[in-house]
From Swiss-Prot:
Biased composition annotated in UniProt, kind: Pro residues: 13-33, 952-967
Residue span(s) of domain Fibrillar collagen NC1: 999-1029
Keywords, alphabetical: Collagen, Extracellular matrix, Secreted
Subcellular location, record wording: Secreted, Extracellular space, Extracellular matrix
Signal peptide: none
Compositional bias (Basic and acidic residues): 67-81, 870-884
GO molecular function annotations of the record: extracellular matrix structural constituent
Protein name in UniProt: Collagen, type I, alpha 1b
Region entry Disordered, spans: 1-990
Biased composition (Gly residues): 163-182, 310-322, 466-477, 498-507, 531-540, 621-630, 645-654
Cellular component terms (Gene Ontology): collagen trimer; extracellular region
Bias-annotated ranges (Low complexity): 34-57, 82-91, 120-129, 136-147, 199-223, 233-267, 299-309, 323-351, 429-465, 478-497, 571-580, 593-620, 655-665, 694-722, 731-743, 830-839, 855-869, 906-934
Amino acid sequence: QMSYVDHSKSSGPPQPGPMGPMGPRGPPGPPGSSGPQGFTGPPGEPGEPGASGAMGSRGPSGPPGKNGDDGEPGKPGRPGERGAAGPQGARGFSGLDGAKGDAGPAGPKGESGAPGENGVPGVMGARGRPGPPGPSGARGNDGNTGPXGPPGXTGPAGPPGFPGGAGAKGETGPAGGRGNEGPQGARGEPGNPGPAGPAGPAGSPGTDGAPGAKGSPGAAGLAGAPGFGPAGAQGAVGAPGPKGNNGDPGASGPKGEPGAKGEPGPAGVQGLPGPSGEEGKRGARGEPGGAGPRGPPGERGAPGARGFPGADGGAGGKGAPGERGAPGALGAQGATGESGSPGAPGAPGSKGVTGSPGSPGPDGKTGPAGVAGQDGRPGPPGSAGARGQPGVMGFPGPKGPAGESGKPGERGPSGATGAVGAPGKDGDVGAPGPSGVAGPAGEKGEQGPAGPPGFQGLPGPQGATGETGKGLGGPTGPRGAPGPAGNDGAKGEPGAAGAPGGLGAPGMQGMPGERGAAGLPGAKGERGDAGGKGGDGAPGKDGARGMTGSLGVPGPPGAQGEKGEGGAVGVAGPTGPRGAPGERGETGPPGPAGFAGPPGADGQPGAKGETGDSGPKGDAGAPGPGGPVGASGPQGPAGPTGPKGARGGAGPPGATGFPGPAGRVGPPGPAGAAGPPGPVGPVGKDGARGARGETGAAGRPGEAGAAGAPGPSGEKGSPGXDGAPGGLPGPQGLAGQRGLPGQRGERGFSGLPGPSGEPGKQGPSGPVGERGPPGPAGPPGLSGAPGEAGREGSQGHDGAPGRDGSAGPKGDRGESGMAGPPGAPGAPGAPGAVGPSGKSGDRGETGPAGPAGPSGPAGVRGPAGPAGAKGDRGEAGEAGDRGGHRGFTGMQGLPGPAGAHGERGPAGASGPAGPRGPAGSNGAPGKDGMNGLPGPLGPPGPRGRNGEMGPAGPPGPPGPAGPPGPPGSGFDFVSQPLQEKAPDPFRGGHYRLRSPDGTQKLPLLDLAPMDVGAPDQEFGVEVGPVCFL
């Protein structure tokens, strides 16, 4: 503390003479009382690693780590439970031709015709055309699992994996470049006494004061105004929120284009479920369960200071396998499957409706000539009358004149049935008959080749929890990475004495206290608590890349990707079983004429009559009996590609694709809640010297001090002017009132980062990750319950024709009856060649999503995976976003307890001349000098330069272990431009002032009296001890 006494108004006896030369240095004084606690020393060297602590409780979820390397594909899952009954199937295909119809009712009585002889059987007709493809057979048993498909395209990046285990210690990095100049070191121990300094300037004369009585203690000063610290930095990003609820079902999509006509054939009846297979091997780990329910929000922590970004933590232990998820929702309809093998022919359908009459066949060939009639008698030549019915053939008369053409005769009765004509052309296909009864299931077909990959299904909802696996406990995993800092524990016992801390910068001045009586020298105080954690060092160089972390948990399903390109066409399947009979072939060419009948007896030759006009075309004869069945025709050409079938059910999931490359670093998470306030930072550097305060009032006279020891005799001085000898100077008076506060000092460095705040509330759900690759196909599940019956199929082909009815009595000629039922089916043609694969059908409409399954319970924590191999160095991350606005200055902290008295250090180098001391006691009268006029008091001289650095002291005891430095990490630290302060004339360097927003000046706040006390109270602000460095 410095007091300033104004002597300008003093008057009285003559002044003492000028000050004599400085005496020799006195012996050291007794030890002083314990000083106030020093400021926190710099952090000591890191200690040896401690023994491993007990495993901590599981910390809150850390931020998402970087993407781990791709893991191996998982093993196939266990067979799923039997699925629920599927939706009603699509309309079935047309049924097979119906069975031969019953014989029709007897026809109307026909006109009696003379029975003709049966003609010779016609030549075998041409081979029929290939029939249409048969209906699909019943579903065969599931084939064996096909070979794994080719690796899928690289999937999107999975979500960040759990942090990997700590990597092996990297090799020592190269020496770094020289760092920036460090902050000022701690004050050295006192040096050895230096050489005597030059004599100080003459002191101004002291006033003659009679020793005053001891003053009474003053009243306690007012409390200081609160300080303004900066607000803490923003807290860390909260952990991702739980998975949101399923959204409402989307609106129905637009109606798709109508598909082409499906392939025929109804599906067979569902077979009975087979016996249960043997229990399969234990399945691989199931997909992760959904996030647990959201925990209650924690209390809001106080804001902490923002630390440097930490490095990625070591890998956590591998979690326990989750229980099996619930069945997913019904996936979207898959692409059309390949046509199944043709089923066995179904039972005959019921009799079809009578078809329309066929077109008349061509006229049959002329039959052989009949036997000649007997000769008639010759008639007289008639006049040319109307042409009568021909009489019996007479003997030939003379040729009469040509008669006129007779009118056409009435229609004669039907002739005898001619020989079977060549088959007529195919009639039109009759209306489809009703569906036949489903045939029995065909035998299991051979396994077809793997089809092309289906489209990716929509993500299913979260499955229900599976049963807990029965595996034995795994070995103990490696030690997990340290959790975040816990809440402050109870205060521990005082630690052992730390090394002496360096002298801290002065704190802000408190209000003046009462002046205490001088105490005896105190005993050496106990060792103070260890100083607070030092500031974070600059980020170290990037360490070697850590070992690869264990495989991350699969991310949530991604959004549905675009439709992939069709896979390559699979290998042709084996030839299907023989198809159903083909349609009737086209009419073959007429067969050659039959053999001639035996010749009749020769008649007598009649006269050749004139050619009559052609008669009208006769009615078609009744159908002849069926000819013998022709041989099977050759195999017809492949039929045209069938129409697009109904969309098949979802195929089994494809094999797991290789994991995609690591995704880019995600955007920064949202700001976390503010952490708790950090500890009080170290006191800032000395402020600039304040303006000179106004002169305080003179203190009361102090009590008389004890007489000093006599100094050695000086040389006799010349006699001085006679002065009234004054008494010994009194002790220093009380300090005058303080001057007004000086200008605000420069901003100190930021305080150490506070302990981590409690975890923030869970952040909002992150965006849905891209869909991961599908897992490998599990073994087939049990057969599903039979679906509802399909819609009725279209009518089958016409049945075979019924047997001929018995001949009825000859009736009047009826109107043409409807054509009889078609004849019996011919022998089946040879199977047609396999047709080319049809084009993929258009994608069906998306089915509605099934209801979400219930959330499964959380799985047991699995054993930790082994540490991965040492990974390559990661790429530098992008610079983070600029920090938030500068906070307000925090409140001034309480003063710390007094520190222990440090041991005495070695002597330092001689310091510069100190400020002027109080006037010494009068020396012996000097020799007479010339009486000079006292000059005016000169201005204070400039501050002297620092003395040379003293020799380094012995090293102190090792300090307590410092806090762990910030981990090396893969981000580039971009510092703000450093603002430079003017050079300090008393240090040979520059201070560097770092301020977040580039400002050099801090806001000054007005202090009004009412901020400190009532209007009628005096107040002052005391400036504490000043340390000139």
